[in-house]
């Protein structure tokens, strides 16, 4: 059992509640690293996982629950890791990385308290966001949580693609995944803007009050340059302001889309919808701002359609000029029980290359025995 949960509490509760209920105490706050897992007596002991975990991360985080998409019944939760602060007055071109997780992945406090998934807690939403922030420095990192998790293990992206009980997709050309993603991000941008600007106003008001109080002090120690130490401190306080970047307008930024394992079903559905998305004013403009798409060891429990293999569909992707990256491991493409995955991956690459796409296709850990650990480790090597 994870070090983040009391073994006694888990033993007591395991027979009484479902695994999901073990972590229902997680925070729903919009700002700050997610709170500790509230499980039994350990919840108030000060030894929860959230406090120690947040100390290992660089804030700030924004956790946005139930962000609406294109339709009222479609909503997803998002976790945003902001890029580092920039000096006041500095404006940088914004890039946003949008990540779709795979099975078992969740917030750290949820995974660390799960009787099975705790062993993969290193690949939690927060840790993945941190890895991606290093991989794409200066970018906004968005983690899109699936709308349903069957048996607390199988990620189901029902808002993006028709899915069975375990999240295996049934792709079509008109489900509305592009419309949902565009609206979801637009609404998430606005929510993040409102939160950050509100907090910035509060900080600015507090800073101005401190400067006013500083300058009103009557006593000061003379300095060698003729300025008092109080004046120097006040000047330093007024000039040292930095602020975290706020998401800009959707049309003024660029995007990278990343799917891992089951999360690749979202990318595939987007590809199936490309032809129609190009015709729509909003999704067409959004599409032009997508610079790259990464498939990271895609796979799901269905018997086919792990990779897009229809030439007429992939032709639409080739015409966009979007960078295509495919990173796989033996866990998926060498699986003898799911041999179609490897065949479909090869066909995906072959068709795109035939269409003139310079696809970045890489096999990682090819000399190793297929393992779930290396499947997750693709995040560290792609």
What are these regions (language model features)?
Residues 58-163:
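Short, surface-exposed "cap/lid" segments of acyl-processing enzymes
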């Amino acid at each position: 059992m994870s070090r983040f949960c009391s073994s006694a509490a888990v033993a007591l509760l395991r027979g009484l509640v479902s695994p999901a209920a073990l972590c229902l105490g997680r925070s729903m706050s919009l700002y700050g690293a997610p709170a500790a897992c509230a499980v039994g007596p350990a919840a108030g002991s000060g030894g929860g996982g959230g406090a120690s975990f947040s100390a290992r991360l660089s804030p700030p985080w924004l956790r946005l629950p139930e962000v609406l998409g294109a339709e009222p019944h479609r909503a997803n939760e998002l976790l945003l890791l902001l890029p580092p602060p920039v000096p006041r007055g500095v404006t940088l071109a914004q890039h946003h990385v949008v990540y779709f997780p795979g099975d078992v992945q969740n917030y750290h406090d949820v995974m660390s308290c799960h009787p099975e998934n705790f062993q993969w807690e290193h690949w939690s939403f927060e840790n993945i966001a941190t890895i991606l922030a290093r991989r794409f420095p200066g970018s906004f990192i968005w983690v899109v949580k699936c709308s349903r998790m069957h048996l607390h293990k199988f990620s189901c992206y029902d808002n993006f693609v028709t899915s069975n009980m375990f999240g295996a997709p049934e792709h079509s050309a008109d489900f509305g995944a592009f419309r949902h993603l565009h609206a979801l991000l637009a609404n998430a941008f606005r929510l993040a803007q409102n939160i950050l600007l509100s907090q910035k106003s509060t900080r600015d008001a507090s800073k101005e009050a401190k400067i006013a109080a500083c300058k009103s002090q009557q006593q000061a120690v003379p300095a060698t340059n003729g300025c008092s130490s109080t004046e120097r401190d006040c000047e330093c306080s007024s000039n040292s302001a930095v602020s975290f970047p706020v998401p800009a307008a959707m049309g003024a930024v660029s995007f990278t889309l990343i799917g891992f394992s089951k999360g690749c079903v979202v990318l595939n559905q987007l590809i199936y919808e490309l032809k129609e998305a190009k015709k729509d004013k909003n999704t067409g403009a959004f599409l032009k701002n997508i610079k790259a798409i990464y498939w990271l060891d895609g796979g799901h429990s269905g018997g086919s359609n792990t990779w897009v293999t229809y030439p007429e569909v992939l032709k639409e992707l080739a015409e966009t000029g979007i960078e295509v990256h495919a990173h796989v491991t033996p866990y998926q493409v060498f699986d003898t029980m799911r041999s179609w995955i490897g065949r479909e991956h090869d066909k995906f690459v072959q068709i795109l290359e035939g269409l003139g796409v310079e696809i970045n296709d890489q096999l990682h850990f090819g000399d190793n025995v297929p393992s779930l650990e290396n499947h997750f480790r693709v995040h560290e090597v792609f």
